[in-house]
């Protein structure tokens, strides 16, 4: 009986986490459409949308054994700049910044940078608030990063 009860609890937890993830994904998609963006899904079911001609991704991940989802809203770029310079710019941009973060990475031969905001959410109100906040902050952070590249 204990095994049966434990199995039911595990199944319920997994199903509720999947519903939470799906709900957050639907909330973000609906919010973006309502704000006038044209969101689509990529091959991983991440949400892709454009802001001022720049591709943004909303990546939703379930948090095991919890009733919330982790969301990363980001824009990725390839830069014809030395990796060390990208890393220095990222570190400089991240000083005294707590919400939007910049990172540098190597992708094979390419040097790349990413500007992202992360949050956790478990309801539509919080999801919409955080997405609006991301859409306010990220374009400015991206612009500042690009200015440093010149």
PLM features per residue range, with description:
Residues 4-15:
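Sec-dependent N-terminal signal peptides
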Residues 15-21:
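Sec/Tat signal peptide C-region and signal peptidase I cleavage site
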Residues 25, 29, 83, 87, ...:
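Extracytoplasmic/secreted envelope proteins and their assembly/folding machinery
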Residues 30, 34-81:
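Ser/Thr-rich, low-complexity intrinsically disordered terminal regions
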Residues 92-96, 127-150:
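Ampiphathic alpha-helical segments that act as solvent-exposed interaction surfaces
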Residues 72-112, 116:
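Short, internal acidic amphipathic alpha-helical interface segments
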Residues 102-139:
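A short, solvent-exposed beta-edge/loop patch
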């Amino acid at each position: 009986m204990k095994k049966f009860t434990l199995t039911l609890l595990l199944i319920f937890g997994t199903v509720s986490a999947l519903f939470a993830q799906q709900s957050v994904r639907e909330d973000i998609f609906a919010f973006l459409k309502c704000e006038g963006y044209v969101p689509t899904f990529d091959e991983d079911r991440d949400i892709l949308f454009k802001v001022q001609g720049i591709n943004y991704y909303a990546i939703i991940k379930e948090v095991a054994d919890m009733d919330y989802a982790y969301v990363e809203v980001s824009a990725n770029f390839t830069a014809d700049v030395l990796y060390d310079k990208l890393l220095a710019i990222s570190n400089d941009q991240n000083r005294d910044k707590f919400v939007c973060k910049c990172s540098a990475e190597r992708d094979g031969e390419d040097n790349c940078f990413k500007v992202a905001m992360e949050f956790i959410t478990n309801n539509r109100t919080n999801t919409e608030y955080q997405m609006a906040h991301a859409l306010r902050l990220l374009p400015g952070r991206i612009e500042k990063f690009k200015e440093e590249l010149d």
